[in-house]
């Protein structure tokens, strides 16, 4: 498999695990025609990396990804970091702030990275960034999350719609 420019570079990290996708989530839902269909990978250094390809329907200004899309992908990527080693715990967003540094194009694969910076019993703080195809930081984010089980979040959870979908072209490094 040939790696895209977003996946190449000295900062490549070994993938330890692929995280599940849902059916209908806007960010990771594989059956959501308008969604990002992002794939999430846990790395050897305790980060979560999302690979996703935004499309014209995700634009704001012509040729540019809408800032809300950046917020969505970073929120989910950072929030998933708590599931490393704790797949039954979910991060529910309390506070999220972003800094936009460069525009993001659509139609190419992009990479978001998230990590926990402070981990308490009921809360955690995280930070993350999205990279341009040439490896520059385009968006940075910081957030705070409450730790919850899925039963505390919703009574409409369907475990059959939340599973890992392995593909032959899944990367071994991101």
Q: Which stretches of residues belong to each language-model region?
A:
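Hydrophobic beta-strand-centered segment that forms part of the acyl-chain substrate-binding groove
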Residues: 3, 77-111
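HotDog/MaoC-like acyl-thioester-processing domains
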Residues: 3-17, 105-106, 117-174
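N-proximal, solvent-exposed amphipathic alpha-helical segments enriched in charged/polar residues
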Residues: 14-26
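A generic structural signal for short beta-strands and their flanking turns/coil linkers
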Residues: 21-22, 34-36, 46-48, 90-96, ...
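Catalytic strand-loop segment that frames the active site of acyl-thioester-processing enzymes
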Residues: 23, 27-65
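Short beta-strand micro-motifs enriched in acidic
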Residues: 41-43, 115-119
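A structural signal for short, well-ordered beta-strand segments
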Residues: 50, 96-100, 114, 128, ...
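Conserved N-terminal beta-strand and adjoining loop/helix that marks the start
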Residues: 68-72
